[in-house]
């Protein structure tokens, strides 16, 4: 279950190795970037909002792909926790107030 993380924007979700990361809403993957810890950040745009899924071990979709809510976008590596950030027109939104976990 998600828990607030005071070191980053968003919530941190503990995830086991090979656990599937799914899109929380319909949208388009606008960015897939490799992070310093050799995991990935995937950014999904939906209207004026974007959701960032950080520390994914293996990405299953390419940039530009349209996805539906619940569709798999990646797998966790078991060494990192998933961080989910939500932004509306550049302003942080607490994902726990919007996303049904």
Question: Model regions: which residues?
Answer:
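Surface-exposed, glycine-biased beta-strand/turn segments
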Residues: 1-40, 68-69, 93-96
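Short, solvent-exposed beta-strand edge segments and adjacent coil->beta transition regions
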Residues: 8-10, 48, 81
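A generic structural motif
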Residues: 17, 33-36, 57-60, 77, ...
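Periplasm/extracytoplasmic soluble domains of Gram-negative envelope assemblies
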Residues: 17-18, 47-48, 79
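Zn2+-dependent peptidoglycan hydrolase active-site motif and core
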Residues: 24-57, 83
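Conserved, short, structured surface segments that act as functional micro-motifs
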Residues: 42-43, 65-101
């Amino acid at each position: 279950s998600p828990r607030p993380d005071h070191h980053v924007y968003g919530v941190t979700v503990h995830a086991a190795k090979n656990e599937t990361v799914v899109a929380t809403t319909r949208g388009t993957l606008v960015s897939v970037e490799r992070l310093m810890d050799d995991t990935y950040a995937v950014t999904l745009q939906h209207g004026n909002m974007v959701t960032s899924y950080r520390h994914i071990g293996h990405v299953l979709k390419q940039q530009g792909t349209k996805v539906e809510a619940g569709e798999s976008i990646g797998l966790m590596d078991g060494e990192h926790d998933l961080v989910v950030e939500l932004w509306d027109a550049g302003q942080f939104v607490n994902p726990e107030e919007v996303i049904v976990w």
